[in-house]
From Swiss-Prot:
MF terms in GO: calcium ion binding
Originating organism: Gallus gallus
Residues annotated for Ca(2+) 3 binding in this entry: D240, D242, D244, K246, E251
Record gene name: SDF4
Lineage top rank: taxon: Eukaryota
Cellular localization per UniProt: Golgi apparatus lumen
Protein name: 45 kDa calcium-binding protein
Length: 356
């Protein structure tokens, strides 16, 4: 019969063997860790931090030539625009709107004049400008890793391509050694356009280095007269069909690329044409000769143009001026709240006197 000592030794050996088998199975069951090959570098940036935005707050037209559908709300609400969300409580939004009304009505006569609205529009536009300046500081730090206060085109190019998913160290090495970069045609086209824009933002004498102020102009052309001209040229280039560097009404209202497949799409296209026709004829074409020049479009696009702000103020008042006294009263602005804030306030008339 096996001795007690021999039995215990045998049991211990069996336990160690089973433990070894389980550990081996666990190792092979785990997925291979390839994250080092596929994972982006920790300092790679999101594409939205790298690319100039298509939408510019407080500017009437998008970078791609589309009308800014939120322009009225942006120049009326400024930084408070985010607070007026459609799903927020109507009573709270009504109170916020009443507070805004009292701020615009600086002479406290219970109505808003065109001059008062003009002053308010300029103030809210400046808020958007200051917001862009603060955001630019963060974006500039993202592309200025050595913190020397300047960003070269190559530094920006590396960050941009890294944001597209390419390995940042490999890109940097290839650019340093003047090696060919294998990127797709679409990315190359974007890169070429960005380089043109970079050159325009580079104040004389050009050195392809942007400081923080120049980088602000690169991202936000509305902050620089020179870059605003460049933006206008880009928009006209995209819309101008006969190459005369001017826009006719038919060129301006041309439908986006695509076919109309159903009634809903047709309605969208009808709205596109109607809105752009009105904007062209009533606002952009200043001398009403049926042609929009670069100079006219530049004046239209300039968010700090006081004459434009006054015209905008008059238009905003006209939308809600039901008693035709050329002023806005509280009841009117509450009734047309969706136009001014993007939020519809229900039962505005019933509550206006009890809350104000």
């Amino acid at each position: 019969m096996m001795s007690r000592q021999a039995f215990l030794c045998s049991l211990g050996s069996l336990y160690l063997s089973l433990l070894f088998v389980f550990l081996l199975m666990d190792v092979y069951a785990r997925p291979a860790n390839n994250s080092a090959l596929k994972e982006k570098p920790a300092d790679s940036r999101d594409e939205n931090e790298i690319l100039p935005p298509d939408h510019l707050n407080g500017v009437k037209m998008e970078m791609d030539g589309h009308l800014n559908k939120e322009f009225h709300q942006e120049v009326f609400l400024g930084k408070e625009m985010e607070e007026f969300e459609e799903d927020s409580e109507p009573r709270k939004n009504r109170k916020k709107l009443m507070v805004i009304f009292s701020k615009v009505d600086i002479d406290n006569d219970k109505k808003i004049s065109a001059k008062e609205m003009q002053r308010w529009i300029m103030e809210k536009t400046d808020e958007h400008f200051q917001e862009a300046v603060e955001e630019n500081k963060m974006h500039f730090r993202a592309v200025d890793p050595d913190g020397d206060g300047h960003v070269s085109w190559d530094e920006y190019k590396i960050k941009f391509l890294a944001s597209k998913g390419l390995n940042e160290k490999e890109i940097a090495e290839k650019i340093k050694n003047n090696e060919e970069l294998k990127i797709d045609e679409e990315t190359q086209e974007v890169l070429d356009n960005l380089k043109d824009r970079w050159y325009q933002a580079d104040n004389p004498p050009p050195d392809m280095l942007l400081n923080e102020e120049e980088f602000l102009s690169f991202l936000h052309p509305e902050h620089s007269r020179g870059m605003l001209k460049f933006m206008v040229k880009e928009i006209i280039r995209d819309l101008d069909q006969d190459g005369d560097k001017k826009l006719t009404l038919s060129e301006f209202i041309s439908l986006p690329v695509g076919t109309v497949e159903n009634q809903q799409a047709q309605d969208i296209d009808d709205d596109w044409v109607k809105d752009r026709r009105k904007e062209f004829e009533d606002v952009i074409d200043a001398n009403h000769d049926g042609i929009v020049t670069m100079e006219e479009l530049e004046e239209y696009m300039d968010p700090m143009n006081e004459y434009n702000a006054l015209n905008e103020a008059k238009q905003m008042i006209a939308v809600a001026d039901e008693n035709q006294n050329h002023h806005l009263e509280l009841e009117e602005i509450l009734k047309y709240s969706e136009y001014f804030t993007g939020s519809k306030l229900m039962d505005y008339a019933r509550n206006v006197h009890e809350e104000f």
